[in-house]
Amino acid sequence: MIVDDKEELDVIFDYMKDKTVLLVPILSDHKLHPIINNISCIYIYTEDGVERIIPMQHTEQIRGFKDQLARFLNLESIFVHDKKVWLQMGGNDAVYDVKSLWWYTYNEAYDENYYYTSAHHFYWRRHTNLNHINAVVPLMQHLEMCQKIRKYAWPMIINSKLTTSYNQFNSIYPKLFAEIESNGMQVTRSFKMNDLITDGRVYSQYHYHTTTGRPSNAFRGFNFAAMNKEDGTRDAFCSRFENGALIEMDFDAYHIRLIARLIGYDLPTTSVHQYFGKQYFGKEELTDEEYEKSKQITFRLLYGGIDKEFLGIPFFGEVNKYISELWAEWKKQGVIYTPVERRPINSSTFPDMTKNKLFNYYLQALETEFSVRRMMQVQNTLKDYKTKLILYTYDSLLFDVPVTEAKEVLIKVKNILQGGEFPVKCKVGNIYSKMNNISL
């Protein structure tokens, strides 16, 4: 079970050729972000039932096989337990993500905590301050955990079809979010969770296998997706560059414009709330109170259901028709597919689904899939610059920008995000809590 010498390891590598393989990397410290972590050991399982655990850095084998890690990282066409983590360890991109396949197959997130053994929890509680604790947890306990993972994952691996949609998702999402996480976020000493700071930075962690597909973003109890603008949470975030700034780009009325795109409706590039307010109140100029009321009405109608009195407004008439057709397809086929990635949303997984909830799920999936495609373009553009994309939150992106690149890079990024149909608002600040509007 446990590989002890290089000759045996060489045999394993030869044996894995042309076989379906499951690989589970076990990080050295469950408290550390993968970006700043190491691999304690690696579990291998092949299609004919051969399994091995290979210590990389572990107390049971002082020498370990750390010098052989590159051979594992270069493997292709294997199934890896968590591809995003694997990429952050330096792994090859040409592998299949087990967690994404689980999500595609069962329409539910992969519950990683379910697989840890009682021994893992015992060591973690007993030695809370010991770094790289998984290098102390007995190898046989790591093996037991991996066998449990294999028990549930392997039947899926050998029976699931790797669809075009899955392959597309597998090639995009782990890599994109691994890159964003790897950029880190610079913080000042005022950041309250000191144990999350490494060399002046903290690292976000995106979880994109959610019910709707909209990523959550939290690590060790800190929610990066819900940093309050008013309570001081954002005060500690600053630029890493000596002469740099944080730039936030927000999609204006993002969901409304995405819906318009779905139904083929042309909205003005000016304020959509002003546009709809004119139709709600029958007047050209709105007071501030009427403008706010217009926003409330629009969001209530789109997320809570469209009242009959508003069906005469062309936009809402078309939206209502689209929602009804989507619901009819769901009821008839038992499945609908997300707009961009064509990921299946099955009725068997959501027995309590309603018409409006289905539309909201569908819209959040569209929001994420569309944003991800734009972020891919942004990342390709930023490869030639020092500017970093450091945070993605639903309808906004946060960048860390050196002043020498600001004008050139930001105009390019804004043009990519807007794409001629999605107006973007920009803010700049030295710290994340104090951002001011700018024009580009």
Residue ranges and their predicted role:
Residues 167-170, 189:
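Short, charged, amphipathic alpha-helical segments
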Residues 74-88, 250, 308-309, 391, ...:
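Short glycine-rich phosphate-binding loop at a beta-alpha junction
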Residues 2-4, 16-18, 24-60, 189-288, ...:
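Acidic, glycine-rich two-metal-ion catalytic cores of nucleic acid-processing enzymes
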Residues 86-89, 169-173, 199, 207, ...:
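A glycine-rich phosphate-binding loop feature that marks nucleotide/adenosyl-phosphate handling sites
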Residues 143, 178-189, 306-307, 397-412:
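Catalytic palm subdomain of template-directed nucleic-acid polymerases
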Residues 2-13, 17-159, 253:
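Conserved DEDDh/DEDDy metal-dependent 3′-5′ exonuclease domain
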Residues 87-163, 173-183, 220, 226-355:
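Helical catalytic core of nucleic-acid polymerases
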Residues 189-192, 403-440:
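Polymerase palm active-site segment centered on the conserved acidic dipeptide of motif C
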